[in-house]
């Protein structure tokens, strides 16, 4: 398994009892890539401070998702913890993408991270706490010399 470093959201109740502050939720369906055993659907907390998605490990295993690596995540209190992650198909708001999901404790609140949101052109409006579609997904032009 590959080991990497990253950060967990600083404003969500996720791992190790961090306090929840965000209130935007969305229905998300996760499916393992390549021959999984079904779909896990849940009410996910949208957290723009989280890079990756997070779901209960037991639910991920039920649908055939297997860990493919581990990553060290820094929690809001500054402590670092290592967690396994797998790769999944992510469906929400009529969109589909694929990405990394952290195998969290079985009682954890699922999180939808910023990578999944940005990859389908959805952003969060902090004032209304709603998700909004961008008119277009930005691409940066690469300069050639």
Tell where the protein language model's regions lie, with residue ranges.
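Pepsin/retropepsin-fold aspartyl endopeptidases
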Residues: 2-145
